[in-house]
Amino acid sequence: MAKQKIRIRLKAYEHRILDQSADKIVETAKRTGATISGPIPLPTERTIYTVLRSPHKFKDSREQFEMRTHKRLIDIVNPTPKTVDSLMKLDLPSGVDIEIKL
């Protein structure tokens, strides 16, 4: 039988919440007897928006806003059925986007 792998990709704007969520997932998977690889920090995505400060003229006066998206990757190698059940029941904070691939 081939090795089964679950790949979990986490995204959030707040890196503290993201790290707490990753720690919860790693702790849960280790407790159920699965092998873990990660959390691996992926490059932070920066989106910059430039807007005019004035509504009418003065084009030289602009303001920039930045939005950062932090990402982490966790691989669970050889997960047990108990691992999958405990990950489904795991309560993670809002603001964290989770993608799971089998």
UniProtKB/Swiss-Prot annotation:
Its GO biological process annotations read:
translation
Q: What PROSITE patterns does the database record attribute to this sequence? A: RIBOSOMAL_S10
Presence of the UniProt keyword Nucleotide-binding in the record: no
One protein family per Pfam: Ribosomal_S10
Q: Which UniProt keywords apply?
A: Ribonucleoprotein, Ribosomal protein
**Under the cellular component aspect of Gene Ontology, which terms does the record hold?**
ribonucleoprotein complex; ribosome
One example GO MF annotation: tRNA binding
Respond yes or no to whether keyword Ribonucleoprotein is given for this record: yes
Query: Which InterPro entries does this entry report, sorted A to Z?
Result: Ribosomal_uS10 (IPR001848), Ribosomal_uS10_CS (IPR018268), Ribosomal_uS10_dom (IPR027486), Ribosomal_uS10_dom_sf (IPR036838)
Among NCBIfam families, the record links this protein to: PRK00596.1 (NF001861), rpsJ_bact (TIGR01049)
Q: Which family does it belong to?
A: Belongs to the universal ribosomal protein uS10 family.
Q: What does the protein in this record do? A: Involved in the binding of tRNA to the ribosomes.
According to the record's subunit comment, the protein's assembly and interactions are: Part of the 30S ribosomal subunit.
Q: Which PANTHER family match?
A: 30S RIBOSOMAL PROTEIN S10 FAMILY MEMBER (PTHR11700)
What is the protein named?
Small ribosomal subunit protein uS10
